[in-house]
Swiss-Prot record:
It is a peripheral membrane protein. [4Fe-4S] cluster binds at C40, C41, C105, C135. It catalyses: a quinone + NADH + 5 H(+)(in) = a quinol + NAD(+) + 4 H(+)(out). GO terms for molecular function: 4 iron, 4 sulfur cluster binding; iron ion binding; NADH dehydrogenase (ubiquinone) activity; NADH:ubiquinone reductase (non-electrogenic) activity; quinone binding. Binds 1 [4Fe-4S] cluster. It comes from Magnetococcus marinus (strain ATCC BAA-1437 / JCM 17883 / MC-1). Belongs to the complex I 20 kDa subunit family. The gene is nuoB. InterPro entries: NADH_UbQ_OxRdtase-like_20kDa, NADH_UQ_OxRdtase_20Kd_su. It is an enzyme of class 7 (translocase). Keywords: 4Fe-4S, Cell inner membrane, Cell membrane, Iron, Iron-sulfur, Membrane, Metal-binding, NAD, Quinone, Translocase, Transport, Ubiquinone. Signal peptide: none annotated. Its main location: membrane. NDH-1 shuttles electrons from NADH, via FMN and iron-sulfur (Fe-S) centers, to quinones in the respiratory chain. The immediate electron acceptor for the enzyme in this species is believed to be ubiquinone. Couples the redox reaction to proton translocation (for every two electrons transferred, four hydrogen ions are translocated across the cytoplasmic membrane), and thus conserves the redox energy in a proton gradient. This is NADH-quinone oxidoreductase subunit B.
Length: 167
């Protein structure tokens, strides 16, 4: 009975899917990241956006304004002086918002881990969704991290589950 109804509706040209899947697909295939390049990892992020790797084919369009972005890519060494600025930029982004931590320095302090002026991982300031390892990570690793975030967005259960309150 259900299969017959599904076939009849499909034959008439209607699309049957849940709103969650449709909205999550749209979100995952049109990510607009805000770049927060702090060190040498930013060069690899620019390389990933150039013509050889072309992140545009994944729906990734880099934005210069946090109000137009839904993803922030933190690339490089985060210092104590820069941490409040990063948090302010993150707070200006509309919900749902996601964070990618790119490189060893952003993930855990990296080479400068024991320095008094370095934050030992941007996850102490922001809730990180995807970590991209490497020093600096390759453009392929950046692409893989973006694809992992797309998978994570597609797995979200409800339309509003991405609008979770973050501290």
């Amino acid at each position: 009975m259900i299969e017959e109804l599904h076939q009849e509706v499909s034959d008439r040209g209607f699309l049957l899917t849940s709103a969650d899947k449709l909205v999550n697909w749209g979100r995952s295939m049109s990510m607009w990241p805000m770049t927060f390049g702090l060190a040498c990892c930013a060069v690899e992020m620019m390389n990933a956006g150039a013509s050889r790797y072309d992140l545009d084919r994944f729906g990734v369009v880099f934005r210069g304004s946090p109000r137009q972005s839904d993803v922030i890519i933190v690339a490089g060494t985060l210092t104590n002086k820069m941490a409040p600025a990063l948090r302010k930029v993150y707070d200006q982004m509309p919900e749902p918002r996601y964070v990618i931590s790119m490189g060893s320095c952003a993930n855990g302090g990296g080479y400068y881990h024991y320095s008094y002026s370095v934050v030992r991982g941007c996850d102490r300031i922001l809730p990180v969704d995807v970590y991209i390892p490497g020093c600096p990570p390759t453009a392929e690793a950046v692409m893989y991290g973006i694809m992992q975030l797309q998978k994570k967005i597609n797995r979200e259960g409800q339309v509003y589950s991405g609008w979770r309150k973050r501290v």
